Design a protein with these regions (language model features):
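RNA-contacting regions in translation and RNA-metabolism proteins
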Residues: 1-190
Length: 190
């Protein structure tokens, strides 16, 4: 059992700070947190906390969604007895925290959508600010002098950024040109 927990923990730990898909399995009435099946079995359901939920979105049992894996920890402590009869504490299972409200979630969605542009240096994401459910601002730059990073991020007719906006419930996303001068950056953001 302990070896299974270690394997599950190690596998889950590699998913930290990445996007995953999961199915909403149970709403915890006292906290409004959701338990989410991400493929680790009933004993290791992930937790989609109220804090990680976007105020713009509504969730229903059975929804299949993308999440950002915020944190992976050992599960809850339990008391067990070893072979000699001594009581000891040990952690059982895995605790996986998910979010859809963080700026990291949006960053991963944008990186997924712009994989080619990021890989070839046309787009470099420099900063993201997010007010979940209201608006996200993304500051982009480029390593290429002949490329407009804002246009490359938005895509023809807005198709690339629209795909990300759809994933986050229609929340508005502003893409601005990055500048090292904070005054210019703020002016670009307004």
């Amino acid at each position: 059992k302990e070896m299974t927990d270690d394997k599950t923990y190690n596998k889950a730990k590699t998913m930290e700070n990445t996007l995953i898909k999961g199915e909403l399995k149970k709403l915890m009435k006292n906290t409004n947190d959701w338990l989410v099946d991400i493929g680790f079995g009933e004993e290791n359901l992930a937790v989609f906390t109220l804090r990680g939920q976007s105020p713009r979105e509504t969730y229903e049992l059975g929804d299949n969604l993308r999440f950002f894996v915020e944190k992976v920890d050992r599960g809850d402590e339990i008391l067990t007895k070893d072979k000699s009869g001594k009581t000891k504490k040990k952690k059982r299972g895995v605790k996986i925290s998910l979010t859809r409200s963080s700026k990291e979630f949006v960053k991963c969605l944008v990186e997924r959508q712009l994989r080619e542009e990021i890989d070839n240096g046309s787009v470099v994401i420099k900063a993201i600010a997010r007010q979940a459910g209201i608006r996200t601002k993304i500051a982009v730059d480029t390593k290429k002098s002949d490329t407009d990073p804002v246009g490359a991020t938005v895509g023809k007719g807005g198709c690339k950024i629209q795909s990300v906006m759809n994933e986050i419930g229609g929340e508005k996303i502003d893409v601005i040109r990055y500048n090292e001068d904070p005054i210019v950056l703020i002016a670009n953001a307004l």
